[in-house]
Amino acid sequence: MATQWEVVIGLETHAQLSTVSKIFSGAATQFGAAPNTQACPVDLALPGVLPVMNKGAVERAIQFGLAIDATIAPRSIFARKNYFYPDLPKGYQISQYEIPVVQGGQITIQVPANEKAGKEAYEKTINLTRAHLEEDAGKSLHEDFAGMTGIDLNRAGTPLLEIVTEPEMRSAAEAVAYAKALHGLVVWLGICDGNMQEGSFRCDANVSVRPVGQKEFGTRAEIKNLNSFRFLEEAIQYEVRRQIELIEDGGTVVQETRLYDPDKRETRSMRSKEDAHDYRYFPDPDLMPLVIDASWVERVKGELPELPAAMQKRFVDQYGLTPYDAGVVTAGKAMAAYYEAVVAKVGAAQAKVAANWLMGEVSSQLNREGLDIADSPVSAAQLALVLQRIADGTISNKIAKEIFLAIWEEKATDEAAADRIIEAKGLKQISDTGALEAIIDEVLAANQKSVEEFRAGKEKAFNALIGQAMKATKGKANPQQVNELLKKKLG
């Protein structure tokens, strides 16, 4: 069934810009304040007040545009988007329509492998349509008011950058990969804190399906306010199934706005989807056109950090990482800095090993305890010493994991923690040939059946003998030497 249909996805992402004050007023943007304590006369739309543009919001938009190789409009216009909602006091939202500040651009994503579907990891470039500045609306509160709705206008006027893609994603996996790449970029640039639980980064997914080979797009449904990557994936997967089943049963997909219910793992209809003309956009007469001269753009460009895409390419070229691995270790600025600090200690020859540890043991522990890399109990220098001891043959990879966990659990602060633990627990790898030969002779004598099976051509028996040798040394034998000595003795 699925092979008859092509999925078409476009994302609209609202990134809350990290300014101290709102986009058109001096009110604070701090999250979690008591309701309506951060709403000034401009936010409340009181008579006689006028909006004043926040320069910091514009600079953050320029940063983003430069980072995605977009065109920064030298002149852009703010428009009024007219609609009624209780948490929109003015009766319109100040946004950009015909001439946005950021035009075009692209983001390259790394889509992970899907073993169940038999798909390998691949790279894809997603083109962006635009990114425009706008103000956020307030918030409706339903829980604390029996039979009524409360309105909190603290969020009204908070600066947003709405980032719109072309409809070029063809699966939920691609949409999630794009959302993660975008999230990583805005956090990397420092223009958004990326806190999805607080609503700083939220996605609307436009989803449609069409028969394979058809050029015309199908009717789309927009799924609003998805504030986690898991919800984004689940919502798209459900919506794709819903639309395909509806069409195959003889029904018609309706253009509408839908909400995702994470408890039921399904989307439900919210309202009919509006078109642009329904909002009666027109230029805001209270705001002059936004003029950005070339010198301003050049100054911002000179202040940009090394971007994730450039760093990924450097890691591939300099350290021999795969594009996917380079993408993982540059998922955040702190992660990339940690990785480079490890490599600086162990040397470029161990760069791939360092990446594997960062994506494996380190990430596993961080995820298990809900920590960011910046809060890792094991420092880059401590991990580097663990990797050095593997490289110089002092410990095996298995023992290294034990030492890593010991450093993690005791929250050791000494850089030489690995050496201290190796010495205290007697974990040095046995590499003495004479000692290993004696152990292997004992293993062979005690496991004659496995010896006979190996000589009869059963390779699994050889692995069993290696396992017995490692068991006899409590995992401290040098695995490579054990392998070589066993082969020698078995002829």
Swiss-Prot record:
One of its GO terms (molecular function) is glutaminyl-tRNA synthase (glutamine-hydrolyzing) activity. Its EC number is 6.3.5.-. One of its GO terms (biological process) is translation. It is an enzyme of class 6 (ligase). PANTHER family: GLUTAMYL-TRNA GLN AMIDOTRANSFERASE SUBUNIT B MITOCHONDRIAL AND PROKARYOTIC PET112-RELATED, GLUTAMYL-TRNA(GLN) AMIDOTRANSFERASE SUBUNIT B, MITOCHONDRIAL. Heterotrimer of A, B and C subunits. Allows the formation of correctly charged Asn-tRNA(Asn) or Gln-tRNA(Gln) through the transamidation of misacylated Asp-tRNA(Asn) or Glu-tRNA(Gln) in organisms which lack either or both of asparaginyl-tRNA or glutaminyl-tRNA synthetases. The reaction takes place in the presence of glutamine and ATP through an activated phospho-Asp-tRNA(Asn) or phospho-Glu-tRNA(Gln). Belongs to the GatB/GatE family. GatB subfamily. This is Aspartyl/glutamyl-tRNA(Asn/Gln) amidotransferase subunit B.
